[in-house]
Amino acid sequence: MFHELKQSKDFLALTLAHPQYLSESFEFDLGEHTHVEVWDTGVIVFSPKQAKHSKDIVLSCAVHGNETAPIELCNALITQILSEELTLAQRVMFLIGNPAAIHNGTRFIDENLNRLFNGAHSRDEGLCNPERIRAHKLEQYVDRFYASQSGERQRIHYDLHTAIRGSKHEKFAIYPYRPGRKYSREQIMFLESCGVNTILFHHEPTTTFSYFSSENYRADAFTIELGKVFPMGQNDMTRFIAMKEMLTLLMTGKDLQLPEFDLKRLNLYQVCRSVNKHFDDFEFNFTNDVENFTAFPKGYTLAKEGGKAVKIEHEFESIVFPNAKVPVGQRTVLMLKTADDSNLD
Protein backbone atom coordinates (compact mmCIF):
# COMPACT_ATOMS: atom_id res chain seq x y z
CA MET A 1 0.00 0.00 0.00
CA PHE A 2 2.92 2.32 0.75
CA HIS A 3 4.35 1.79 -2.75
CA GLU A 4 0.88 2.11 -4.27
CA LEU A 5 0.37 5.53 -2.67
CA LYS A 6 3.92 6.73 -3.36
CA GLN A 7 3.47 5.91 -7.04
CA SER A 8 -0.11 7.09 -7.64
CA LYS A 9 -0.26 9.93 -5.07
CA ASP A 10 -4.02 9.29 -5.16
CA PHE A 11 -5.17 8.82 -1.57
CA LEU A 12 -8.83 8.59 -2.57
CA ALA A 13 -8.08 5.65 -4.89
CA LEU A 14 -6.24 3.86 -2.08
CA THR A 15 -9.15 4.56 0.28
CA LEU A 16 -11.79 3.28 -2.13
CA ALA A 17 -9.73 0.16 -2.84
CA HIS A 18 -9.95 -0.59 0.90
CA PRO A 19 -13.32 0.90 1.98
CA GLN A 20 -13.59 -1.01 5.28
CA TYR A 21 -10.07 -0.88 6.72
CA LEU A 22 -6.36 -1.06 5.91
CA SER A 23 -4.56 -4.24 6.89
CA GLU A 24 -1.81 -2.13 8.46
CA SER A 25 -0.88 1.49 9.04
CA PHE A 26 2.29 2.88 7.47
CA GLU A 27 4.44 6.01 7.42
CA PHE A 28 7.12 7.64 5.29
CA ASP A 29 8.89 10.94 4.67
CA LEU A 30 8.54 13.46 1.87
CA GLY A 31 12.10 14.67 1.38
CA GLU A 32 13.50 16.37 4.46
CA HIS A 33 10.40 18.43 5.16
CA THR A 34 7.25 16.34 5.86
CA HIS A 35 6.45 13.15 7.75
CA VAL A 36 3.39 11.24 6.47
CA GLU A 37 1.35 8.74 8.47
CA VAL A 38 -1.58 6.68 7.18
CA TRP A 39 -3.50 5.45 10.22
CA ASP A 40 -6.46 3.77 8.55
CA THR A 41 -8.48 3.87 5.37
CA GLY A 42 -9.29 7.52 4.70
CA VAL A 43 -7.01 8.80 7.49
CA ILE A 44 -3.75 10.54 6.56
CA VAL A 45 -1.61 12.87 8.70
CA PHE A 46 1.07 15.29 7.48
CA SER A 47 3.57 16.74 9.99
CA PRO A 48 6.23 19.33 9.06
CA LYS A 49 9.68 18.16 10.17
CA GLN A 50 11.48 21.50 10.12
CA ALA A 51 8.93 24.27 10.53
CA LYS A 52 7.93 25.49 13.98
CA HIS A 53 4.23 24.78 13.64
CA SER A 54 1.47 26.20 15.85
CA LYS A 55 -1.75 24.86 14.34
CA ASP A 56 -3.35 21.40 14.22
CA ILE A 57 -5.77 21.35 11.29
CA VAL A 58 -8.38 18.67 10.58
CA LEU A 59 -10.02 18.70 7.14
CA SER A 60 -12.81 16.13 6.87
CA CYS A 61 -15.02 15.20 3.95
CA ALA A 62 -17.37 12.36 2.96
CA VAL A 63 -19.08 12.11 6.32
CA HIS A 64 -21.89 11.68 3.80
CA GLY A 65 -20.62 9.47 0.99
CA ASN A 66 -22.47 11.13 -1.91
CA GLU A 67 -21.21 14.67 -1.15
CA THR A 68 -18.49 14.53 -3.75
CA ALA A 69 -17.14 18.07 -4.22
CA PRO A 70 -15.38 18.17 -0.83
CA ILE A 71 -13.94 14.71 -1.53
CA GLU A 72 -12.46 15.90 -4.82
CA LEU A 73 -11.19 19.10 -3.18
CA CYS A 74 -9.46 17.28 -0.32
CA ASN A 75 -7.99 14.63 -2.60
CA ALA A 76 -6.55 17.33 -4.88
CA LEU A 77 -4.85 18.96 -1.87
CA ILE A 78 -3.51 15.60 -0.66
CA THR A 79 -2.11 14.87 -4.13
CA GLN A 80 -0.37 18.26 -4.22
CA ILE A 81 1.22 17.56 -0.84
CA LEU A 82 2.31 14.03 -1.81
CA SER A 83 3.72 15.41 -5.08
CA GLU A 84 5.67 18.00 -3.02
CA GLU A 85 4.01 20.85 -4.88
CA LEU A 86 2.99 22.12 -1.43
CA THR A 87 5.30 22.18 1.58
CA LEU A 88 3.31 22.37 4.80
CA ALA A 89 4.11 24.63 7.73
CA GLN A 90 1.30 23.26 9.94
CA ARG A 91 0.17 19.78 10.98
CA VAL A 92 -2.80 18.60 8.90
CA MET A 93 -5.01 15.52 9.15
CA PHE A 94 -7.33 14.67 6.26
CA LEU A 95 -10.28 12.40 7.03
CA ILE A 96 -12.39 10.72 4.35
CA GLY A 97 -15.31 10.02 6.64
CA ASN A 98 -17.36 7.18 5.14
CA PRO A 99 -15.42 5.32 2.42
CA ALA A 100 -17.97 2.49 2.26
CA ALA A 101 -20.75 4.98 1.44
CA ILE A 102 -18.61 6.62 -1.28
CA HIS A 103 -17.99 3.18 -2.72
CA ASN A 104 -21.75 2.57 -2.57
CA GLY A 105 -22.61 5.97 -4.07
CA THR A 106 -24.95 6.75 -1.17
CA ARG A 107 -25.25 9.24 1.68
CA PHE A 108 -24.68 6.43 4.21
CA ILE A 109 -24.94 2.64 4.52
CA ASP A 110 -27.17 2.14 7.58
CA GLU A 111 -27.30 5.39 9.55
CA ASN A 112 -26.49 9.09 9.17
CA LEU A 113 -22.86 9.33 10.32
CA ASN A 114 -23.17 13.01 11.24
CA ARG A 115 -25.74 12.15 13.94
CA LEU A 116 -23.35 9.73 15.69
CA PHE A 117 -20.53 11.83 17.17
CA ASN A 118 -19.88 13.03 20.70
CA GLY A 119 -20.53 9.52 21.99
CA ALA A 120 -23.87 8.97 20.20
CA HIS A 121 -22.35 5.97 18.39
CA SER A 122 -22.35 3.95 21.62
CA ARG A 123 -25.84 4.84 22.87
CA ASP A 124 -28.97 2.69 22.45
CA GLU A 125 -27.96 -0.23 20.19
CA GLY A 126 -24.24 0.55 20.53
CA LEU A 127 -21.63 -0.16 17.86
CA CYS A 128 -24.02 -2.20 15.72
CA ASN A 129 -23.43 -0.89 12.17
CA PRO A 130 -20.65 0.50 9.94
CA GLU A 131 -21.42 4.17 10.65
CA ARG A 132 -21.40 3.74 14.43
CA ILE A 133 -18.09 1.88 14.29
CA ARG A 134 -16.60 4.50 11.96
CA ALA A 135 -17.78 7.43 14.13
CA HIS A 136 -16.10 5.84 17.14
CA LYS A 137 -12.85 5.40 15.21
CA LEU A 138 -12.94 8.94 13.78
CA GLU A 139 -13.30 10.35 17.30
CA GLN A 140 -10.26 8.33 18.37
CA TYR A 141 -8.22 9.63 15.43
CA VAL A 142 -9.13 13.26 16.17
CA ASP A 143 -8.22 12.73 19.83
CA ARG A 144 -4.88 11.15 18.90
CA PHE A 145 -4.11 13.97 16.46
CA TYR A 146 -4.89 16.81 18.86
CA ALA A 147 -3.53 15.14 22.01
CA SER A 148 -0.10 14.45 20.52
CA GLN A 149 0.87 18.14 20.74
CA SER A 150 1.20 20.21 23.89
CA GLY A 151 1.47 23.91 24.65
CA GLU A 152 -0.40 26.86 23.17
CA ARG A 153 -1.77 25.71 19.84
CA GLN A 154 -4.72 26.56 17.62
CA ARG A 155 -6.93 23.60 16.82
CA ILE A 156 -9.05 23.83 13.67
CA HIS A 157 -11.61 21.45 12.18
CA TYR A 158 -13.40 22.19 8.92
CA ASP A 159 -15.94 19.45 8.13
CA LEU A 160 -16.77 19.89 4.44
CA HIS A 161 -20.16 18.97 2.96
CA THR A 162 -22.56 19.69 0.12
CA ALA A 163 -26.33 19.95 0.51
CA ILE A 164 -29.11 17.87 -1.05
CA ARG A 165 -31.35 20.92 -1.56
CA GLY A 166 -30.75 24.14 -3.47
CA SER A 167 -30.01 27.23 -1.39
CA LYS A 168 -30.54 30.98 -1.52
CA HIS A 169 -26.96 31.18 -0.15
CA GLU A 170 -24.88 28.67 -2.12
CA LYS A 171 -22.14 28.27 0.50
CA PHE A 172 -22.73 28.49 4.24
CA ALA A 173 -21.26 27.27 7.51
CA ILE A 174 -22.72 26.09 10.80
CA TYR A 175 -20.84 27.39 13.84
CA PRO A 176 -21.38 24.82 16.63
CA TYR A 177 -22.87 25.81 19.98
CA ARG A 178 -20.02 26.92 22.26
CA PRO A 179 -21.30 28.17 25.63
CA GLY A 180 -18.90 30.46 27.46
CA ARG A 181 -16.89 31.15 24.29
CA LYS A 182 -17.56 33.96 21.87
CA TYR A 183 -17.53 33.32 18.15
CA SER A 184 -14.35 34.27 16.28
CA ARG A 185 -14.48 37.24 13.90
CA GLU A 186 -11.17 36.08 12.42
CA GLN A 187 -12.55 32.62 11.63
CA ILE A 188 -15.68 34.13 10.10
CA MET A 189 -13.60 36.39 7.85
CA PHE A 190 -11.41 33.42 6.89
CA LEU A 191 -14.56 31.64 5.73
CA GLU A 192 -15.73 34.79 3.93
CA SER A 193 -12.41 34.80 2.06
CA CYS A 194 -13.13 31.15 1.15
CA GLY A 195 -16.38 32.28 -0.47
CA VAL A 196 -18.51 31.22 2.51
CA ASN A 197 -20.25 34.42 3.62
CA THR A 198 -23.28 32.94 5.41
CA ILE A 199 -22.89 31.73 9.01
CA LEU A 200 -25.44 29.92 11.21
CA PHE A 201 -24.87 30.04 14.97
CA HIS A 202 -26.21 26.85 16.54
CA HIS A 203 -28.26 27.07 19.72
CA GLU A 204 -27.69 23.71 21.43
CA PRO A 205 -25.35 20.70 21.69
CA THR A 206 -25.53 18.29 18.76
CA THR A 207 -23.99 14.99 17.66
CA THR A 208 -22.22 16.40 14.59
CA PHE A 209 -18.52 15.94 13.88
CA SER A 210 -17.75 19.67 14.13
CA TYR A 211 -19.54 19.97 17.48
CA PHE A 212 -17.49 17.03 18.79
CA SER A 213 -14.20 18.82 18.01
CA SER A 214 -15.43 22.19 19.24
CA GLU A 215 -16.80 20.88 22.53
CA ASN A 216 -14.07 18.39 23.45
CA TYR A 217 -10.94 20.10 22.10
CA ARG A 218 -11.99 23.77 21.94
CA ALA A 219 -11.27 23.67 18.23
CA ASP A 220 -12.36 26.38 15.84
CA ALA A 221 -14.75 23.99 14.14
CA PHE A 222 -17.42 24.37 11.47
CA THR A 223 -19.72 22.28 9.33
CA ILE A 224 -19.20 23.91 5.93
CA GLU A 225 -21.68 23.48 3.08
CA LEU A 226 -20.06 24.14 -0.30
CA GLY A 227 -23.05 23.95 -2.62
CA LYS A 228 -25.23 21.21 -4.04
CA VAL A 229 -24.65 17.46 -4.32
CA PHE A 230 -23.45 16.21 -7.72
CA PRO A 231 -22.09 12.81 -8.82
CA MET A 232 -18.33 12.26 -8.62
CA GLY A 233 -16.56 13.95 -11.51
CA GLN A 234 -19.49 16.24 -12.35
CA ASN A 235 -18.62 19.07 -9.95
CA ASP A 236 -17.56 22.46 -11.32
CA MET A 237 -14.36 22.72 -9.28
CA THR A 238 -13.86 26.35 -10.34
CA ARG A 239 -16.54 27.16 -7.75
CA PHE A 240 -14.13 26.09 -5.01
CA ILE A 241 -11.00 27.98 -6.11
CA ALA A 242 -11.20 30.49 -3.24
CA MET A 243 -11.66 27.70 -0.68
CA LYS A 244 -8.71 25.76 -2.05
CA GLU A 245 -6.48 28.85 -2.15
CA MET A 246 -7.28 29.84 1.44
CA LEU A 247 -6.79 26.30 2.77
CA THR A 248 -3.44 26.21 0.95
CA LEU A 249 -2.35 29.48 2.56
CA LEU A 250 -3.45 28.18 5.97
CA MET A 251 -1.61 24.86 5.66
CA THR A 252 1.59 26.36 4.23
CA GLY A 253 1.78 29.12 6.85
CA LYS A 254 1.48 32.01 4.41
CA ASP A 255 -0.09 35.38 5.26
CA LEU A 256 -3.87 34.95 5.01
CA GLN A 257 -4.39 38.66 4.29
CA LEU A 258 -7.84 38.58 5.85
CA PRO A 259 -10.01 41.68 5.45
CA GLU A 260 -11.28 43.59 8.45
CA PHE A 261 -14.52 42.25 9.89
CA ASP A 262 -17.38 43.76 7.89
CA LEU A 263 -20.98 42.87 8.69
CA LYS A 264 -22.07 44.12 5.25
CA ARG A 265 -20.16 41.24 3.61
CA LEU A 266 -21.91 38.59 5.71
CA ASN A 267 -25.26 36.92 6.29
CA LEU A 268 -25.54 35.93 9.95
CA TYR A 269 -28.30 33.68 11.28
CA GLN A 270 -29.13 32.34 14.73
CA VAL A 271 -30.71 28.91 14.96
CA CYS A 272 -33.82 29.59 17.05
CA ARG A 273 -35.14 26.02 17.27
CA SER A 274 -35.04 22.53 15.86
CA VAL A 275 -38.29 20.89 14.77
CA ASN A 276 -38.20 17.19 15.61
CA LYS A 277 -40.40 14.46 14.20
CA HIS A 278 -42.83 12.86 16.68
CA PHE A 279 -45.17 10.93 14.35
CA ASP A 280 -44.76 8.98 11.12
CA ASP A 281 -47.28 11.24 9.36
CA PHE A 282 -45.03 14.35 9.63
CA GLU A 283 -45.20 16.41 6.43
CA PHE A 284 -44.09 19.90 5.43
CA ASN A 285 -46.48 22.48 4.06
CA PHE A 286 -44.16 23.41 1.20
CA THR A 287 -42.89 21.68 -1.95
CA ASN A 288 -39.67 19.69 -2.22
CA ASP A 289 -38.00 22.33 -4.40
CA VAL A 290 -38.19 25.09 -1.76
CA GLU A 291 -34.62 26.29 -1.15
CA ASN A 292 -32.65 26.48 2.07
CA PHE A 293 -32.99 29.94 3.71
CA THR A 294 -36.53 30.47 2.40
CA ALA A 295 -38.33 32.64 4.99
CA PHE A 296 -41.90 32.19 6.25
CA PRO A 297 -43.99 34.73 8.22
CA LYS A 298 -45.25 34.37 11.78
CA GLY A 299 -48.30 32.14 12.02
CA TYR A 300 -47.61 30.23 8.81
CA THR A 301 -48.25 26.49 9.12
CA LEU A 302 -44.83 25.01 8.44
CA ALA A 303 -45.77 21.36 8.90
CA LYS A 304 -48.40 19.00 10.25
CA GLU A 305 -48.13 15.81 12.30
CA GLY A 306 -50.34 13.87 14.66
CA GLY A 307 -53.29 16.10 13.79
CA LYS A 308 -51.47 19.26 14.95
CA ALA A 309 -49.90 22.18 13.09
CA VAL A 310 -46.30 23.35 13.51
CA LYS A 311 -46.38 27.12 13.08
CA ILE A 312 -43.81 29.88 12.58
CA GLU A 313 -43.27 31.55 15.96
CA HIS A 314 -41.15 34.66 15.18
CA GLU A 315 -41.85 37.54 12.80
CA PHE A 316 -39.93 35.64 10.13
CA GLU A 317 -38.14 32.30 10.28
CA SER A 318 -35.99 30.74 7.57
CA ILE A 319 -35.52 27.03 7.02
CA VAL A 320 -32.38 24.98 6.48
CA PHE A 321 -31.92 21.22 5.98
CA PRO A 322 -35.64 20.29 5.79
CA ASN A 323 -36.12 16.51 5.60
CA ALA A 324 -39.47 14.97 6.52
CA LYS A 325 -38.19 11.44 5.89
CA VAL A 326 -35.95 11.19 8.97
CA PRO A 327 -36.82 8.58 11.63
CA VAL A 328 -39.20 9.55 14.44
CA GLY A 329 -37.28 11.43 17.12
CA GLN A 330 -34.81 13.07 14.73
CA ARG A 331 -34.64 16.66 13.51
CA THR A 332 -36.69 17.52 10.43
CA VAL A 333 -35.52 21.12 9.98
CA LEU A 334 -33.54 23.93 11.59
CA MET A 335 -35.35 27.25 11.99
CA LEU A 336 -33.35 30.47 11.70
CA LYS A 337 -33.72 34.14 12.49
CA THR A 338 -31.31 36.89 11.51
CA ALA A 339 -28.45 37.56 13.93
CA ASP A 340 -26.11 40.46 14.70
CA ASP A 341 -22.45 40.54 15.73
CA SER A 342 -23.02 41.01 19.48
CA ASN A 343 -21.62 37.58 20.41
CA LEU A 344 -18.44 37.81 18.33
CA ASP A 345 -14.92 38.22 19.67
Curated annotation (Swiss-Prot):
Enzyme class (EC, first level): hydrolase
Pathway: Amino-acid degradation; L-arginine degradation via AST pathway; L-glutamate and succinate from L-arginine: step 5/5
GO MF, one example: hydrolase activity, acting on ester bonds
Pfam family, one: AstE_AspA_cat
Keywords: Arginine metabolism, Hydrolase, Metal-binding, Zinc
Record flagged with keyword Magnesium: no
Sites where the protein binds Zn(2+): H64, E67, H161
Name of protein: Succinylglutamate desuccinylase
